[in-house]
Design a protein with these regions (language model features):
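A short mid-domain helix/strand-loop element embedded in enzyme catalytic domains
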Residues: 139-171
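Catalytic cores of nucleic-acid ligases and guanylyltransferases
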Residues: 29, 88, 214-222
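C-terminal helix-cap and adjacent tail motif
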Residues: 219-279
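Coil-to-beta-strand transition motifs
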Residues: 23, 100-102, 196-199, 210-214
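Conserved metal-phosphate-binding beta-hairpin within the catalytic cores
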Residues: 107, 199-219
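A long amphipathic alpha-helix within ATP-dependent nucleotide-binding catalytic cores
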Residues: 169-200
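Generic recognition of stable, solvent-exposed alpha-helical segments in well-folded globular domains
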Residues: 48, 52, 172, 176-179, ...
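Active-site loop/lid in soluble adenylation, ligation, and acyl-transfer enzymes
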Residues: 1-151, 257-263, 267-295
Length: 295
């Protein structure tokens, strides 16, 4: 079966969520979003890459923070999903239910994107004062924790201060998610450097399971992170990347962010799919072969 006939119990920009009793089945589709818009085209293999990279990082950092992953093996999924195993292979994970902490935990190691824009305006990133003289792709003196609110689909996330984060979730939880975000980012950046990758920035989400702050959703994927090839890194320039920046760049050049979201040209779809698969191979050190072919 090449799709799910069963309607999801909830739907995000990229993931479909199904109730599975004491757990959830989280399915990473091939949908792609940019600038908080869901685009009309799908990117081949994207969902599987996201799902399997997340599983890789969850396993790698299990000693730093607990996570919600139960299994990505369709044989472990509840029987009610058995008829969909071919479709789910590689792109779905069974996860523990969590009480979501309503904060996007963004860590920035380099100056780019919206951070560069606000730095150019007032010398700060999310209210944090930075040294003078930084430029596009400058490495920051220390990684920054820059939280934002979690917006509903169609709305935009709002950058907030750490103090505002404390007001929303309480100082204890805010401190835990800040410290964990920075710890995971630093460990991931150190590992990625051995693979020839710079993690410019990334986003984590956390929940509470059995009273413990737990890493949930996705982890260090091309959707939630900017991955730059270290070999071609050059401060002061826009960096090539193994993520959806290719799509963002095309949209910036060809769409004014009003009206219907445009279809992507075939070369952007194919190029993005290739970048995602390349990211998987470089990060995990294994050749990408779709699990669907072996389901």
């Amino acid at each position: 079966m090449t799709t799910m006939e069963r309607r999801p119990d909830s739907r995000g920009k990229v993931r479909d969520i199904y109730d599975a009793g004491e757990n959830l089945l989280m399915v990473a589709t091939d949908r792609i979003s940019a600038f908080d818009f869901i685009l009309p085209d799908e990117i081949p293999f994207k969902g599987e890459v996201l799902n399997r990279i997340s599983a890789f990082w969850f396993d790698k950092f299990a000693d730093i923070v607990p996570n919600h992953l139960v299994s990505i093996d369709p044989a472990d999924f509840p029987e009610e999903f058995a008829e969909y195993r071919d479709y789910l292979a590689g792109r779905a994970m069974l996860v523990k239910k969590a009480q979501t902490i309503p904060i996007e935990c963004i860590v920035r190691g380099y100056l780019t994107g919206s951070g560069k824009k606000t730095y150019d305006e007032n010398g700060t990133v999310c209210g944090i004062q930075l040294p003078e003289g930084l430029t596009e792709a400058s490495k920051l003196p220390e990684p920054l924790f820059t939280p934002s609110t979690k917006a509903e689909i169609g709305d935009h996330d709002e950058n907030i201060s750490f103090e505002r984060c404390c007001e929303i979730v309480g100082e204890d939880i805010a401190t835990q998610i800040r410290d964990l975000s920075l710890k995971i980012y630093k460990a991931a950046a150190e590992y990625a450097a051995t693979r020839g990758i710079i993690i410019a920035d990334t986003k984590f989400e956390f929940g509470v399971i059995d009273g413990k702050v737990t890493l949930i959703d996705e982890c260090l994927t091309p959707d939630s992170s900017r991955f730059w090839p270290a070999a071609s890194y050059e401060e002061g320039k826009i960096q090539p990347s193994y993520d959806k920046q290719f799509v963002r760049n095309w949209l910036k050049a060809n769409w004014d962010m009003t009206g219907e979201t445009p279809h992507l040209p075939a070369e952007v779809i194919d190029g993005t799919s290739e970048r995602y698969r390349e990211a998987f191979q470089i990060i995990t050190g294994t050749q990408f072969t779709s699990m669907k072919e072996n389901a």
